[in-house]
């Protein structure tokens, strides 16, 4: 029965035999009963005893742990491990959500016409309205304060502080989204306005956006430090740090996932290539008994079933010199090249190379001295 083995299979077989010679009780494992039967069939014996790994580090050369049951898989495939790792659910970060409120959904408040340039009279009127709004705010009349700030904004829409102070009043009414809208405009008009960062940071804290809140409150402290802002910053910092650490962890996991996906794809590509090479018959590592030549033995045996080929081979084997008779027959001559190692037909049959198998050109015969014309009569 012909079969095909790759060079890598031979290396594994040699390693297996070397290991068995050093650890003969290894052959007593249930998985290797057929090998033990083979040894005993030819008069050999396997020492009794149980293989415990010992010098082999508890590992078998074909994988798995020494002493493992035959029906247990030695190791889970790497691809399965990768699939499990890639599909692991991402953990959620635990935050202290005390003080977080439901977001408001009121229509956007009037923001005024930014392109309008206020007159001196309008600026003065807006300043008076701001004073009235501050008074109403001090009396905790927050709706009234918002209405007065709105009038001041319509008169002088380019005043960033008016928007920030109206945002503060919205904050008191537990309307963080409205506060954020006003603070966004205030910071667009004046990016160095500490009040805009302060009140927007507080609004974001109420919505549970701790990382963004910490960023705003930190910036407010840099621009104009006050104790209330610092207290708010300390309140959000623990949750903000947890979120930042969790985000960095997820970024690392994502990077690792991409690396594992790439490695898995590379392994699969290698396996597919190996399968393709094996199915195409390989080349240098194939043999099935006899002298390995350049061809697949199954093809050679098939050609030998041809009566003409079989007769020619018998003729050559009986007299190697007869190979020259078939130099002009491609079917027979090419088959011989497949059988011969390296395809060197001449060397295989004791001749000086492949050209020896072909009829040599007749060499011109030198003229005898008796017939040399020396030009003399």
Curated annotation (Swiss-Prot):
It is found in: Cytoplasm. Residues 294-336 form the STI1 domain. GO terms for biological process: chaperone cofactor-dependent protein refolding. Keywords: Coiled coil, Cytoplasm, Phosphoprotein, Repeat, TPR repeat. One of its GO terms (cellular component) is cytoplasm. Its main location: cytoplasm. Residues 68-123, 243-302, 344-377 are annotated as: Disordered. Changing residue 105 to N: In strain: XCPA112. Residues 243-277, 355-369 have a biased composition (Basic and acidic residues). Residues 282-293 have a biased composition (Gly residues). The modification Phosphoserine is found at residue 80. Residues 239-276 form a coiled coil. TPR repeats lie at residues 126-159, 161-193, 195-227. One of its GO terms (molecular function) is heat shock protein binding. SUPFAM superfamilies: TPR-like. Residues 89-105 have a biased composition (Acidic residues). It comes from the Eukaryota. PANTHER family: HSC70-INTERACTING PROTEIN. One HIP oligomer binds the ATPase domains of at least two Hsc70 molecules dependent on activation of the Hsc70 ATPase by Hsp40. Stabilizes the ADP state of Hsc70 that has a high affinity for substrate protein. Through its own chaperone activity, it may contribute to the interaction of Hsc70 with various target proteins. This is Hsc70-interacting protein 1. It comes from Drosophila melanogaster.
């Amino acid at each position: 029965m012909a079969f095909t083995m790759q060079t890598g299979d031979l290396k594994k077989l040699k390693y297996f035999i070397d290991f068995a010679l050093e650890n003969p009780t290894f052959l007593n494992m249930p998985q290797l009963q057929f090998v033990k039967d083979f040894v005993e069939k030819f008069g050999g014996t396997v020492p009794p005893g149980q293989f415990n790994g010992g010098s082999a580090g508890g590992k078998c050369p074909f994988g798995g742990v020494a002493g493992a049951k035959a029906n247990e898989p030695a190791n889970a495939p790497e691809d399965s491990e990768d699939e499990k790792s890639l599909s692991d659910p991402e953990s959620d970060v635990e935050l202290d959500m005390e003080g977080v409120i439901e977001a408001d959904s009121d229509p956007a408040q009037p923001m005024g016409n930014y392109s309008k340039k206020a007159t001196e009279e309008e600026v003065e009127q807006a300043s008076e309205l701001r004073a009235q709004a501050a008074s109403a705010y001090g009396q905790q009349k927050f709706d009234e304060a918002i209405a007065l700030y709105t009038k001041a904004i319509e008169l002088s829409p380019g005043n960033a502080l008016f928007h920030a102070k109206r945002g503060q009043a919205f904050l008191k009414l537990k309307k963080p989204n409205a506060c954020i809208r006003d603070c966004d405009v205030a910071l667009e008009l004046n990016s160095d306005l500490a009040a805009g960062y302060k009140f927007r940071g507080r609004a974001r804290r109420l919505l549970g956006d701790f990382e963004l809140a910490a960023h705003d409150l930190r910036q407010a402290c840099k621009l104009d430090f006050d104790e209330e802002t610092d207290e708010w910053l300390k309140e959000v910092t623990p949750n903000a740090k947890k979120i930042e650490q969790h985000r960095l962890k997820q970024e690392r996991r994502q990077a690792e996932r991409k690396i594992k996906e790439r490695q898995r794809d590379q392994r699969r590509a290698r396996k597919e290539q190996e399968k393709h090479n094996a199915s195409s018959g390989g080349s240098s590592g194939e043999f099935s008994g006899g002298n390995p030549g350049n061809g697949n033995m199954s093809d050679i045996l098939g050609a030998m079933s041809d009566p003409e080929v079989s007769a020619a081979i018998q003729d050559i084997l009986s007299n190697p010199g007869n190979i020259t008779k078939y130099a002009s027959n491609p079917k027979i001559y090419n088959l011989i090249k497949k059988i011969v190692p390296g395809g060197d037909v001449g060397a295989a049959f004791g001749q000086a190379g492949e050209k020896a198998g072909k009829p040599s050109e007749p060499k011109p015969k030198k003229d005898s001295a008796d017939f040399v014309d020396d030009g003399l009569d």
